C-alpha cells in the first residue's frame, strides 16, 4: 500500500482534485502534518478533510521538540486538544497518529551532553503513545529515522508492539516489523517530489473504527 506525507511545505497540495489525482496514481494513504511547537500547520485542516473526501485514508503527525516527559505531556495534550477542536475522530484518522521524533541539532545536543539518554528517549516516545491511547485514540505510533530508533532507543527491545514508521532511504528497511517504511524523499506524487512510504501493517485500515461523528462536515455527511 502506497503512502505519501505532506506538511506546510506542500501548501500547494490542498484540493480534493489534488488528492483524487494522487489516489488515481496508486496512493492509498496520506499523512498530514498537524503541527510543531504548539503551532497548527496552516493548511492541515483543508488537507485532512479534502483527502478524506477524495477517498484516501488519512493520518496525522506532530513534530516533537520534547526532551523530557513534562514537555512530552504538553505536546500530547496539545495534540489531543487540537484534534478535538478540529472535530476529528478515529474514524477520520484511519491511518493513525504519528509522533515525529527525529534527529536534529537540538536533540543531538541533548544526547551528546548526556541530558537525554536512550532510556529517556524511549520513555518520551512511550509516554506520548500512552497519553493519546488513554484519550481514546487507538492507533498511535512513532516516526523516526532508522539510526535513532535502532541505535539510540529501546523501542524494539522494550515495547515492540508500538507501531513504527521508519525512515530509511535505502533499498530495504532494516528495522524489524515496521508498520510503514519511508523509503524516499523524492517520490513522484502528481508530478511533485515528496516523501513516500510503503505501508506494510495497517490493522486500522482493515478494520476501521465505526463512524462516530455528527460534526456535519462534508466527509462525514456522506
Could you describe each region identified by the protein language model?
Residues 71-74, 150-157:
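Glycine-rich, charge-decorated loop segments at or immediately adjacent to ligand/cofactor-binding or catalytic sites
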Residues 106-108, 149-152:
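Short catalytic/ligand-binding loop motif for oxyanion handling, primarily in non-cytosolic enzymes
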Residues 28-29, 148-149, 162-164:
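Accessory recognition modules or surfaces
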Residues 62, 144, 168:
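Short beta-strand/turn micro-motifs composed of small residues
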Residues 1-8, 16, 155-222:
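Functionally critical loop-and-helix segments that line ligand-binding/catalytic clefts
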Residues 1-129, 133-135:
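Substrate-binding cleft of extracellular glycoside hydrolase catalytic domains
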Residues 135-151:
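Aromatic-lined carbohydrate-recognition surfaces of secreted/lumenal glycan-active proteins
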Residues 58, 138-140, 164:
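Hydrophobic anchor at the start of a short beta-strand
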Amino acid at each position: 500500500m502506497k503512502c505519501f506525507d505532506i506538511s506546510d511545505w506542500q501548501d500547494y497540495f490542498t484540493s480534493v482534485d489534488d488528492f483524487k489525482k494522487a489516489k488515481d496514481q496508486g496512493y492509498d494513504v496520506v499523512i498530514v502534518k498537524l503541527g510543531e511547537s504548539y503551532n497548527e500547520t496552516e493548511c492541515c485542516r483543508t488537507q485532512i478533510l479534502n483527502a478524506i473526501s477524495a477517498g484516501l485514508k488519512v493520518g496525522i503527525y506532530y513534530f516533537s521538540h520534547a526532551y523530557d516527559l513534562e514537555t512530552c505531556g504538553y505536546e500530547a495534550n496539545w495534540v489531543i486538544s487540537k484534534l478535538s477542536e478540529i472535530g476529528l475522530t478515529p474514524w477520520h484518522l484511519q491511518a493513525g497518529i504519528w509522533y515525529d521524533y527525529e534527529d536534529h541539532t537540538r536533540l543531538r545536543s541533548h544526547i551528546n551532553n548526556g541530558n537525554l539518554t536512550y532510556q529517556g528517549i524511549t520513555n518520551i516516545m512511550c509516554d506520548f503513545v500512552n497519553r493519546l491511547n488513554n484519550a481514546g485514540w487507538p492507533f498511535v505510533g512513532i516516526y523516526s529515522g532508522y539510526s535513532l530508533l535502532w541505535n539510540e532507543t529501546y523501542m524494539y527491545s522494550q515495547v515492540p508492539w508500538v507501531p513504527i514508521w521508519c525512515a530509511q532511504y535505502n533499498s530495504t528497511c532494516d528495522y524489524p516489523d515496521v508498520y510503514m517504511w519511508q523509503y524516499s524523499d523524492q517520490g513522484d506524487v502528481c508530478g511533485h517530489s515528496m516523501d513516500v512510504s510503503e505501508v506494510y501493517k495497517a490493522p486500522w485500515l482493515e478494520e476501521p473504527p465505526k463512524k462516530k461523528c455528527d460534526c456535519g462536515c462534508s466527509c462525514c455527511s456522506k
